Amino acid sequence: MTTYTNGNYTQPKTLDKDEQLAGLAVTLANAAAFPMILKSAFELKILDIFSKAGEGVFVSTSEIASQIGAKNPNAPVLLDRMLRLLASHSVLTCKLQKGEGGSQRVYGPAPLCNYLASNDGQGSLGPLLVLHHDKVMMESWFHLNDYILEGGVPFKRAHGMIQFDYTGTDERFNHVFNQGMAHHTILVMKKLLDNYNGFNDVKVLVDVGGNIGVNVSMIVAKHTHIKGINYDLPHVIADAPSYPGVEHVGGNMFESIPQADAIFMKWVLHDWSDEHCVKILNKCYESLAKGGKIILVESLIPVIPEDNLESHMVFSLDCHTLVHNQGGKERSKEDFEALASKTGFSTVDVICCAYDTWVMELYKK
């Protein structure tokens, strides 16, 4: 049921199936608007204004324009057009407020806003949104058709090299990439550390492909008996801060991995083809002592896609790996078991879930 008007939005109208389907098609055709508006709201720190204002507080677009330092006299009107879209997606709330000049829309934070605001570095999906919609990443999508018809990874078609090489040539994008990974990691790791008890017997832990070290730093902060090693490409760890109990080591996981009794990998295997994953897991096997384990943190795809949140999340992520990575893909539990069987590891044990990711253990036989 949708409410339509002759100006006052009070007359109910029930959409028939044809109108509902057409409306959905129109929404899909216009879908680019929402993430780009949301990206701007994050980058302009508008979401932070709402998040810090708190539940039940409403702010006018004139106040927001002032707080973000807008010099454009039309900014309040432009912001209203942006924010009403965000309110329609439950990122914000909205109500009419009467004033001397008549009624105006004012906005406040909805619960979803707190997951997208910067949260003073305490975990956010906002930087991941910015990464996925950065101009460097977006260019890949324009090569998808050619990839399907002719081959050639879209990111490499767009930029002449694979993503992980490109980050070493573009300092700005390298920072955007690292921030997207780091802030998503904080959010996921908080939940993971509450739900997963598999670090208690670990003495030396290597985070393979650990980016700037957020994963292992949070693990070591809670499990202080662990010696943590953050292992990634040299240009990646060059951007890494110092953490107590963590050593940053530069290298290539396809060539060697530091010795450890446990290896942690979050969102690493999904970036690579099965052949590449076998090479990575073989290097992990060489690194681990007998009985050592890999702690994998990855999404798990359902067998049949459905119109639900789980399918939307994992299949969207899968298509990101499709265009940006060389053979990258999301996998099922059976897919991970097939990789494990080729590399000498035991059956994959699925332990627990942390937001959109699953924690799995693979033991060296």
From Swiss-Prot:
Top-rank EC class of the record's enzyme: transferase
Phosphoprotein as UniProt keyword: no
Record: residues binding S-adenosyl-L-methionine: D232
Expression across tissues: Leaves and roots. The levels found in the leaves are 25 times greater than in the roots.
One Gene Ontology biological process: inositol metabolic process
Alphabetically ordered keywords of this record: Methyltransferase, S-adenosyl-L-methionine, Stress response, Transferase
Active site residues per record: H270
Catalytic activity: myo-inositol + S-adenosyl-L-methionine = 1D-4-O-methyl-myo-inositol + S-adenosyl-L-homocysteine + H(+)
SUPFAM superfamilies linked: S-adenosyl-L-methionine-dependent methyltransferases, Winged helix' DNA-binding domain
Pathway: Polyol metabolism; myo-inositol metabolism
Gene3D superfamilies attached to this UniProt entry: Vaccinia Virus protein VP39, Winged helix-like DNA-binding domain superfamily/Winged helix DNA-binding domain
Similarity remark: Belongs to the class I-like SAM-binding methyltransferase superfamily. Cation-independent O-methyltransferase family.
Function text: Catalyzes the methylation of myo-inositol into ononitol (1D-4-O-methyl myo-inositol), the first step in the biosynthesis of the cyclic sugar pinitol which has osmoprotective properties.
Name of the protein this chain belongs to: Inositol 4-methyltransferase
Source organism of this protein record: Mesembryanthemum crystallinum
Gene transcribed to yield this protein: IMT1
